[in-house]
Amino acid sequence: MDGGYGSVTIVHDARSPEDVFQDFCGRRSGIVKALTIEVEKFYKQCDPEKENLCLYGLPNGTWAVTLPADEVPPELPEPALGINFARDGMQEKDWLSLIAVHSDSWLLSVAFYFGARFGFDKKARERLFMMTSSLPTVFEVVSGGVNTQSKTANGSSKNKSGSKPPKRPNSDSKPQKQVQAKYEEENGGRGNGGDEDQAETICGACGEAYANGEFWICCDICETWFHGKCVRITPAKAEHIKHYKCPGCSNKRTRE
């Protein structure tokens, strides 16, 4: 759908809200990665000595820090300009939160720009709005406010990981991974039929919901659940991690 950071190739065939939502999800995923998993790389690229820089989320789930589009007016709505200038003048978490808020605004503006260009009627716009609203905002992900009911009150020294992240706080003293493994062993490898509840758990990196059979791991600092693939952790690697810290928490502690 997009031909570059700030340009767009419009196809005049009928485009659905689902098409625009897919574009929205890709751009959002890229921005979330920049502000969480790949925050160290993002931080370095936002050099205050450089010119006005913008953070672009791309439809393929990647991101780019670069100069704004040369076209005036730009073909696509532009993200916040000059995000690099405030980097060293603010607390890092406040700086990232500010960028997240502006990014949320930009994502919606791009989505509804496409809606206008594709001639969406009232029902199509409402459907697009409902789909975009079904995901946590970038700000909620960055600030750690994503789906608080998915956090577990687990006092175990073993990191929380497994194939089924919980929907509600779990007072069980055993790690979720051990509980699930024991249940499946006793039931011949069958799940507990709670997929409907589990589907509401959101990955803190990509913002996608839980799907049956996926491996997830929970950060012991911020207690946010992640797809193992999103944070490059495999089930085998998780077995040797006593306390897991997600990339965002690790990077914050490194610079403090």
From Swiss-Prot:
The listed locations are: Nucleus
Bias (Low complexity) ranges: 154-164
What is the first-listed, main subcellular location in coarse terms? nucleus
- PROSITE patterns this protein is in? ZF_PHD_1, ZF_PHD_2
- Biological process annotations from GO: chromatin organization; regulation of DNA-templated transcription
The PHD-type zinc finger ranges are: 200-252
Pfam families linked to this entry? Alfin, PHD
Instruction: Provide one Gene Ontology cellular component.
Output: nucleus
**Which residues lie within the region annotated Disordered?**
149-195
List UniProt keywords, sorted A-Z: Chromatin regulator, Metal-binding, Nucleus, Transcription, Transcription regulation, Zinc, Zinc-finger
InterPro entries reported in the protein's UniProt record: Alfin (IPR045104), Alfin_N (IPR021998), PHD_AL_plant (IPR044104), Zinc_finger_PHD-type_CS (IPR019786), Znf_FYVE_PHD (IPR011011), Znf_PHD (IPR001965), Znf_PHD-finger (IPR019787), Znf_RING/FYVE/PHD (IPR013083)
Q: Which GO terms describe its molecular function?
A: histone binding; transcription cis-regulatory region binding; transcription coregulator activity; zinc ion binding
Which residue positions does UniProt flag as site: Histone H3K4me3 binding? Y210, W216, D220, W225
Matching CDD domains, A to Z?
PHD_AL_plant (cd15613)
Any S-S bridges, and between which cysteines?
A: none
Subunit structure comment from the entry: Interacts with H3K4me3 and to a lesser extent with H3K4me2.
Give the family from UniProt.
Belongs to the Alfin family.
Query: What is recorded about the domains?
Result: The PHD-type zinc finger mediates the binding to H3K4me3.
User: What function does this protein fulfil?
Assistant: Histone-binding component that specifically recognizes H3 tails trimethylated on 'Lys-4' (H3K4me3), which mark transcription start sites of virtually all active genes.
Q: What is this protein called?
A: PHD finger protein ALFIN-LIKE 4
State the organism of origin. Oryza sativa subsp. japonica (Rice)
